[in-house]
UniProtKB/Swiss-Prot annotation:
This is Sulfite reductase [NADPH] flavoprotein alpha-component. Its cofactor is FAD; FMN. It is an enzyme of class 1 (oxidoreductase). Belongs to the NADPH-dependent sulphite reductase flavoprotein subunit CysJ family. PROSITE patterns: FAD_FR, FLAVODOXIN_LIKE. It comes from Vibrio parahaemolyticus serotype O3:K6 (strain RIMD 2210633). PANTHER family: NADPH OXIDOREDUCTASE A, NITRIC OXIDE SYNTHASE-RELATED. Residues 87-225 form the Flavodoxin-like domain. One of its GO terms (cellular component) is cytosol. FMN binds at residues 93-98, 140-143, 176-185. The gene is cysJ. It comes from the Bacteria. Pathway: Sulfur metabolism; hydrogen sulfide biosynthesis; hydrogen sulfide from sulfite (NADPH route): step 1/1.
Length: 623
């Protein structure tokens, strides 16, 4: 089904470090009154506040015209006679986790006085590795073992014949992933392998971090920076200058993943029909006074609480009353409270199943644990409460939390533009619900937002910026958007933004779902945008409205000639939604379009589409 435009069917800060490098001490530029005032203020701050304030001062210093005459500049001049040794940090990130770890590493390196540069993998030229002495790569893994979109080019370069010998390079790799997937931390493992093959030396063992990565990543960063300081000093490549506390880098916002903003739920409205098999909610959250800003393509992180009833059900399965206490981050909590607010109690994982098989003695689970594929399939389709139901087992409170991962926030693609909604943020949330042995099962975050959180209630949120899913800078550039189901969310943001910017570029949307009458999300809005001309074209695919199922990839192929023409006209392509099937099918459809309409062999068509990704003209936000 297709719709065209306008139609619709004070001391010397270095006096204790004089032995480090033999540099002259850096004199304090503060008078006694300034220094005493600073000391009094600093003494009242927490460590988190100190980190923020130090970065704030550093940011101010960087923008002062007289910065060249500051003690930092003097310190730099004192070591400039020697070759500049530095640490280069490269992040390969899809959703922002690896970027966050890399930014934390950068801040910590600066606080240690280490010269450091931070690069998005898409902005780093692989050949420059031959000029580096110390590199740390922070890499997440996308989909089924694929490199994140921003790292595809670097990942391919290191496998190519053009990759240089790296015998002078020392490196470290921190890999992020989810052990529920077969190719756990694959991208990080790849980078480790490729660098070693090119002759580089690892100065610290690679760490493979699971979804609750924060503590492990923090410890690894500490150890890695210690080794970097040792090797930089021993190699005499550069002297480590211990900078004043004010030189630590600033965080981008007062509110972040570790320090979320307590916002208010304004609206939770079901936008699927009463006879739909889905419950999809339009969520509006008030950010007034937070100072939080976002761009189209960004995500909102939501810290949610688990169902109290589910926590009680789990406790009953393992013989606990709920009043037993556990220690979580130095805080003593009842086990029931801990399950509600601190631990993941919905989604299972292979490690949990294997450990419970051992504790319970369940023959069924022990047999599953011997087959990785079957174990992975079972854990993906069985919630924790149902794993524990396999065999009644008495656990202590500490044994129970030893099986569980820490609770992590859920990221949702933002469905609004601040140019349109100001200090609000909108989401499109599909409630995850299904039956298991005649029992209703729900997703943790989606049921919190759609069922348990009432309008006017508090929700802790933060903005996760996504530089890998951004509108073209040139407003005349055409865009093609493919977003079935809740994958429509960022494109609502895109269209709102393009309308408010009076962007002249054409906009083409492919949307799909089950039925036209029950599942056409934001239907009235798309009608309005078609009528006004903001939306140039809309093609929809409702899979259950006819005998033969039709999906968005079929609509792309039906319009192959026009899609190819838009690509030739410079269009950017965006895909959002399911990674397991939809994204792959859409990718294959685009390759077929290039093959047929571009009159090129299949291999060349594949390369053409991959080149679009490298040029950031083909961007994906898939999950």
């Amino acid at each position: 089904m297709s719709f065209q435009k306008n139609e619709y069917s004070h001391k010397n800060v270095s006096e204790d470090n004089n032995g480090q490098g033999g540099n002259p001490p850096i004199a304090s530029p503060l008078n006694d009154q300034q220094f005493n005032s600073l000391q009094q203020t600093v003494s009242e701050l927490s460590s988190q506040q100190l980190a923020w304030v130090s970065g704030y001062f550093w940011g101010l210093a960087q923008h002062q015209p007289s910065a060249a005459a500051t003690p930092i500049a003097q310190a730099a001049a004192a070591v400039s006679a020697k070759p500049a040794g530095k640490l280069t940090i490269i992040f390969a990130s899809q959703t922002g986790n690896a970027k966050g770890v890399a930014e934390a590493l950068e801040q910590e390196a600066k606080a240690e006085g280490i010269a450091v540069e931070l690069f998005d993998a898409s902005d780093y030229k692989g050949k420059n590795l031959a000029k580096e002495t110390h590199v740390i790569i922070v890499a997440s893994t996308n989909g089924e073992g694929e490199a994140p979109d921003n790292a595809i080019e670097l990942h391919e370069f290191l496998q190519s014949k053009k990759a240089p010998k790296l015998s002078n390079l020392q490196y470290g790799v921190i890999a992020l992933g989810d052990s529920s997937y077969e190719f756990f931390c694959q991208t990080g493992k790849d980078f480790d392998t490729y660098l070693a093959k090119l002759g580089a030396t690892s100065f610290i063992e690679r760490i493979d971090c699971d979804v609750d990565y924060e503590a492990a990543a923090e410890e690894w960063r500490k150890n890695a920076l210690g080794k970097v300081k040792e090797t930089l000093s021993s190699g005499n490549e550069a002297e480590i200058v211990q900078l004043p506390v004010g030189q630590a880098a600033a965080s981008h916002s007062q509110y972040n993943k570790q320090n979320p903003y307590t916002a208010t739920l304004l609206t939770s409205q079901k936008i699927t029909g009463r006879d739909s098999g889905k419950d999809v909610r339009h969520i509006e959250i008030d950010l007034d006074g937070s100072g939080l800003t976002y761009q189209p393509g960004d995500a909102l992180g939501v810290w949610y609480e688990n169902s109290s009833e589910l926590a009680s059900d789990i406790l009953g399965k393992v013989g606990l009353s709920g009043v037993e206490t556990v220690d979580v981050d130095g805080e003593s909590l009842s086990i029931h409270s801990a399950l509600v607010s601190k631990f993941e109690i919905t989604t299972s994982n292979p490690q949990l199943v294997a450990k419970f098989a051992e504790l319970s003695g369940s023959k069924k689970l022990q047999k599953l644990a011997e087959d990785k594929d079957k174990l992975r399939e079972y854990s993906a389709n069985t919630q924790i409460v149902d794993v524990f139901a396999e065999k009644k087992t008495k656990l202590t409170a500490d044994e129970l939390v030893g099986l569980l991962r820490r609770l992590t926030p859920r990221l949702y693609s933002i469905a609004s533009s601040q140019a349109e909604v100001d200090e609000e943020v909108h989401l499109t949330v599909g409630l995850v619900e299904y039956d298991h042995n005649d029992e209703k099962r729900y997703g943790g975050a989606s049921s919190f937002l759609a069922q348990r959180l009432e309008e006017g209630g508090d929700v802790k949120v933060f903005v996760e910026h996504n530089n890998n899913f951004k509108l073209p800078e040139d407003d005349t550039t055409p865009i093609i958007m493919v977003g079935p189901g809740t994958g429509i969310a960022p494109f609502r943001s895109f269209i709102q933004e393009r309308e408010n910017r009076d962007a002249e570029g054409k906009n083409w949307l492919f949307f799909g779902d089950r039925t036209f009458t029950q599942d056409f999300l934001y239907q009235v809005e798309w009608q309005k945008y078609l009528k006004s001309g903001v939306l140039s074209r809309l093609d929809v695919a409702f899979s259950r409205d006819q005998v033969e199922k039709v999906y968005v990839q079929h609509r792309i192929l039906e319009n192959a000639a026009q899609v190819w023409q838009w690509i030739q006209d410079g269009a950017y392509i965006y895909v959002c939604g399911d990674a397991t099937r939809m994204a792959k099918d859409v990718h294959d459809a685009l390759v077929i379009v290039a093959e047929q309409e571009g009159k090129m062999p299949r291999d060349d068509a594949e390369q053409f589409i991959n080149d679009l990704r490298k040029a950031k003209r083909y961007q994906r936000d898939v999950y």
